[in-house]
Structure formats: C-alpha cells, structure tokens
A protein has these predicted regions:
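Phosphate/dinucleotide-binding and metal-coordinating scaffold of catalytic cores
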Residues: 2-319, 323-422
C-alpha cells in the first residue's frame, strides 16, 4: 500500500470495480490479486466443474479461474483455494490427445478458435475445448455448464442393438480410415468411442484385415485374458470381424452402467503433480505406496503387468498406459484395470513398415527379482503364447505370428525360470 500511496479500502474498491477482469484470493493469510486471462472465443475465465458419480448423480466438483500468464485458480468446498502454475492435472489428462484427440481437433476446426492440427493447440485452446465441446471424456469430470447440458443430452441418445453393431463399426472404420488428422505417431491405433445396448461404454480399436495391427488386436484380447487368469484386474475385451476389418471392443472401466462414472487419472498426470519422475511403472507404483495412494497389492499388480510386458514384447509402457481410479469421495481407489498391453515391438512403425517377427528380448529393468511377481507373469505369458499358437478366434491370427509364438513362449519361460520360487 505504501508504494501505491493508497489505503486498503481504496484498493478494495478499485478491485471491486475491476471484478470482471481481476480476481482476488488468499493463500494462508496473504491476499493476492490477479488479472483474469482472455480466452479464445471470449469464453468466461470463471467456470464451474461438475462430476458424475458412480450412481449417475451429478455433483459439484470445483470452480476455476484462469489467470493471465497461464495459471489456474481452483476453489473447492472442502480444500479451499489452490493455485496451479498451468492447468490442473485433471484438465491436462482430459484434454484431447492421440488418435481420438486428433479426431476431436478435426471435428471442431471449423470454429475459428481452434487450430486444425492438435499439435498447434496450446493451453488456451485446451481450456476452450474442455468448457465448450467436451462430452463423454475419460473419467467423471464435466467442464462448464455448456458441456453439462451436452452430457444430459448425451444420455438421451438411443442405444444401438447388438445385431446392428457390426454394421455401424464398419461404417465408422470406413469413415476414419480416410482421415489422417495430421501425422500419426508410428503404431498408434485408430479407434472410436461407442455405447451399445449389449457392450455398454467401449473404446473400439480397428485395423484392416491382413495388416500387422489386425494380427495384434487378437493378441491384445489374449493378453488381457491371460493377465486376468492370474489375478490381475484387466479391461474386458471382445473381438469382432467383418470381411474388411478386425475390431476390438475394450470395456471402459470408468463407466458404471449407462450413466454412472468413475474418476480416473493417468499415471502421467499423477506423477507430474506429485513426483515429477516418469521413470518406470514399478518405480511409480512404489512411490504411490509410500505416499498412501496405492496398496502393496496394487503395486504388485503393476509389477506383474511390467514383467508380463517384458515376456510378451510390450515395448510401449509409457505413463498414459496405466491409470489410477478415484472414488466418489475423491480418494484414490487403486490402480485401474490393465489396458493397452500387447506385443507392441511388432506394431507397424508408420509408412507401411512392419518390424521383423523376431523373438522377444526380455530384460529385468526395474522390476527386480521378486519370485511371486515373475511366477505370476511367467504363468500369464505361458498361457498367452500358447493361446496365440493354437486358439481360433473371431479374428484370425496369421501363420507367421503363430510360428513366432512358439519361439517366444520358450524365450519367455527360459528368461523367467531363474526368478521362480524353488
């Protein structure tokens, strides 16, 4: 006040007069003032966030204010005020990314506020999308009143009957295969979201028959089943095939019935917020156990997922491929069911190039030598490669992949043998 040569009351009156563009808040006993951000399309920088509970009921989550310079002010009923340097982790997680994200960017590109390419989006574009266009996001948060109304409208959409589903899937695949949405990362799987009467909420991956990815989708189905058989929770999957395409339905574990939802955050969002490491799955799980976010059982499941990945050639173990569930009370509920675990070392690398079908090369990495972890992973891997060798599925597995499975089964079992309980 001395530097400004004004009284506190004069400053307060000035701030009230500027309330449309300036906000004030306290961190502890210290008052702060901040300029609100100008967002694309003139979107209000003050917004509400709701959440959909597992029962389908809608609850208040937080109010947010977007500040000049990129910060975000979060106001909740329980925890008071929190200031983030950028977007809160749940917004970064919910923002469009990957193949689905490029679909969304393409669909809103006719609005002047959004660049055509997702690569050109910044946080302002992400905020604008989340609070004007986002519907049916991962997790249970709904951003803004406009999107809340869209979610209520979404509940009224008629569900497609099971016998009509494959026809719709083929139509979606035909439409999406002609759209690149910008340069796709090598091996990234085309997919779309679906709600069916028989399947519920699913993510549908697809590939043209005869392609390498058409070989790998049945393997993802078998990998999920093999992990589940040794006690690791996994996403439920189902294979379908038409004359042209192979489809893999992955049941969404963040959905409960037709209307209920479960909160979730990727390991990347959690790690960025609390640890800033992004090293390996087992190390992340160990940190979460120490912080009280995960149980030792959860950490063991993560280690089994990592060890199993080594034994099947899953080289794509980034921090968006495991997630944590959040209960209705806002507490971490545990590790999410396993998903996106398959032999990605054989996935197409772009430009029509497929890696050679050579045997896997497992490594210990940071998994350690725990006998129970390797016993479970080895058992799952044996079941997996045996199924790849012999099982007849709705979508066929090629002869070269079946022949490779026999060699990989031996490599996996030989590698795990020294770690197994005596």
């Amino acid at each position: 006040m001395e530097l400004l040569n004004i009284s506190q009351s004069t400053l307060s009156r000035a701030m009230r007069d500027l309330s449309a563009t300036v906000t004030n808040f306290r961190v502890g006993r210290t008052p702060y003032y901040a300029l609100l951000r100008a967002l694309p399309g003139g979107i209000n920088p003050r917004q509400r966030i709701s959440r959909i509970l597992s029962t389908g009921h809608i609850d208040h989550f937080a109010e947010v204010e977007f500040l000049a310079g990129g910060g975000t002010l979060e106001i909740t009923y329980n925890d008071g005020v929190r200031l983030y340097d950028g977007l809160p982790p749940y917004m970064s997680f919910a923002a469009p990314s990957g193949f689905l994200g490029r679909q969304l960017a393409h669909s809103v590109a006719n609005r002047n506020m959004f660049p055509v390419s997702l690569k050109d989006w910044n946080d302002d574009h992400r905020v604008a999308f989340l609070f004007t266009e986002a519907v049916n996001l991962a997790g249970n948060l709904v951003f803004g009143d406009t999107c809340l109304q869209s979610e209520l409208n979404f509940r009224k959409y008629p569900l497609v009957e099971a016998e009509e589903k494959l026809e719709y899937y083929v139509g979606m695949a035909q439409q999406l295969k002609t759209m690149s949405y910008g340069s796709s990362a090598g091996g990234e799987q085309p997919k779309f979201l679906w709600v069916g009467r028989d399947s519920g909420h699913v993510i549908v991956k697809f590939a043209r028959r005869g392609s390498r990815m058409a070989d790998l989708l049945p393997l993802e189905h078998l990998a999920m089943r093999s992990l589940a058989e040794v006690g690791v929770p996994t996403a439920e999957t189902e294979l379908l095939a038409s004359d042209q395409f192979v489809f893999l339905e992955v049941r969404r574990f963040d959905r409960v019935g037709e209307q209920g939802r479960v909160g979730m955050l990727s390991a990347g969002a959690v790690d960025d917020e609390f640890f800033g490491k992004r090293d390996t799955w087992p190390e992340f799980a160990a940190r979460c156990v120490n912080a009280g976010y995960l149980s030792k059982q959860d950490a063991e499941h993560v280690s089994v997922m990592a060890a199993f990945s080594e034994l099947i050639g899953n080289s794509d173990r980034h921090f968006e491929n495991i997630s944590m569930l959040i209960a209705d009370d806002g507490e971490y509920q545990g590790i999410a069911p396993a998903y996106d675990i398959l032999p990605m070392r054989y996935a197409s690398i772009g430009g029509g190039v497929d890696p050679e079908l050579v045997p896997i090369e497992p490594k210990v990495g940071t998994i350690g030598s725990g006998p129970r972890v390797w016993a479970l992973a080895s058992k799952a891997a044996e079941r997996f490669w045996s199924a790849v060798m012999t099982e007849e599925l709705a979508a066929p597995i090629s002869r070269p992949m079946r022949e490779l499975a026999e060699r990989n089964r031996k490599v996996a079992l030989d590698f795990a043998a020294p770690f197994l309980p005596v």
